[in-house]
Amino acid sequence: HLSDRRQRQMCIRDRICPDAPEKCAASPTGFQWFDLMDQSPEQILSKSLVAENKLNKLIDEVKEKYDLKANDIIIGGFSQGCMITLQTGIKRKDTVNSIVGYSGRIISTEHLSKNIVSRPNIILMHGDLDQVVPIESLLEAKEFFGKNNYEIETKIFKHCEHRIPTEGSSLG
């Protein structure tokens, strides 16, 4: 069952908008799926697989609780949340409707290219002044998904740092 906290985090019936399960080590007001600081790419991938399992479990709980099909569900995330939703969303056997990602990147293109299972709609948005996750991450993701025959929409926000601007919320 979803906790009361998780239910409050549901934006609307068919979207999952959870906070990550841990308080963010780098930002006391933020949340994280796992600590990214001082980690090797292998450690980050390993920890992301644990986070992926947690998100899959949450998606399955939501499907059951609200009697939804995977295609009724849109998943999204900001920063590390975007990274986890991208990894999780395209590896699910039951394809979610869409992935909406803000200011994130692909954790491992090598891992992801070997594990593509589904093809949800994808929209990625990023600020052109983001210094936490550079804009190049969006361009790399766009190239990756293009090479793997995904239709992907992208939006770059002018004069925007590492945040979700109002326009981005509306597009999502």
PLM region descriptions:
Residues 34-74:
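Gly/Ser-rich "nucleophile elbow"/oxyanion-hole loop immediately N-terminal to the catalytic nucleophile
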Residues 13-29:
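Conserved alpha/beta-hydrolase
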Residues 139-172:
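C-terminal catalytic histidine-bearing segment of alpha/beta-hydrolase fold enzymes
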Residues 123-126, 130:
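Short beta-strand/loop motif that positions the catalytic acidic residue
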Residues 94-106:
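A conserved short beta-strand
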Residues 74-77, 100-102, 125:
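Short beta-strand immediately N-terminal to the catalytic nucleophile in serine-hydrolase-like folds
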Residues 76-81, 85:
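Gly/Ala-rich beta-loop-alpha elbow adjacent to hydrolase catalytic centers
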Residues 1-8, 12:
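Single conserved hydrophobic/aromatic residue that forms the stacking wall/gate
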